[in-house]
Design a protein with these regions (language model features):
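N-terminal segments that cap or nucleate solenoid repeat domains
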Residues: 1-37
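Glycine-rich hexapeptide-repeat left-handed beta-helix
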Residues: 1-12, 46-54, 60-62, 67, ...
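Generic amphipathic, hydrophobic interface segment in small proteins and small subunits
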Residues: 31-55
Length: 178
């Protein structure tokens, strides 16, 4: 794990946030409390600022970056699926879900409880309205919206990652060290 300053900018990491040993967090990065940063994730605050709210999960091999002098902003309880790339987004609002392998590009705006499907590409400046689902390349917003049942299910899934952030510091024991 690399948690490092870059040109005088040091990551700020909230209480109870877990960063996997193979993840990298450096530069102007703020992580809220209770976040889970998975294996291979790269959160790069070398060009611009990265701000994640509380209880976010950044799954395996994600990349989060910002343009020089700009900020990538991510709300609370956001799930970023395995292998997703988040680049210089204007805002990913609370409870949003970014599917595995999705790309969310510059100045995109993802609404509260919005879902970006697996492998989707959200283009520069594109807006995904709250509680809507976007899929495809390029991402298209579906008429179908997120149901209360779906929200309840994802609330449980999101809590699983908050629980992992508490369990990993003691539970993760590399072979030969336990």
């Amino acid at each position: 794990m690399t948690i490092a300053s870059f040109e005088g900018q040091t990551p700020r990491i909230g209480a109870g946030t877990y960063i996997h040993p193979s993840a990298d967090v450096f530069g102007s990065v703020t992580l809220g409390q209770g976040c889970w940063i998975g294996p291979g994730a790269r959160i790069r605050g070398d060009y611009g600022d990265i701000v994640l709210g509380d209880y976010c999960s950044v799954e395996d091999n994600c990349v989060i970056h910002a343009r020089p002098g700009e900020q990538t902003s991510i709300g609370n309880w956001v799930t970023i699926g395995h292998g997703a790339v988040i680049h210089n987004v204007e805002m990913i609002h609370d409870y949003a879900i970014i599917g595995m392998g999705a790309v969310v590009s510059d100045w995109a705006l993802i609404g509260e409880w919005a879902v970006v499907g697996e492998g989707a590409v959200v283009r520069q400046g594109q807006e995904i309205p709250p509680e809507h689902i976007a899929v495809g390349v390029p991402a298209k917003v579906l008429e179908k919206t997120v149901s209360e049942e779906y929200k309840a299910q994802w609330t449980r899934f999101k809590q699983t990652y908050v629980d992992l952030a508490r369990r990993y510091p003691e539970g993760w024991v590399p072979e030969g060290e336990g």
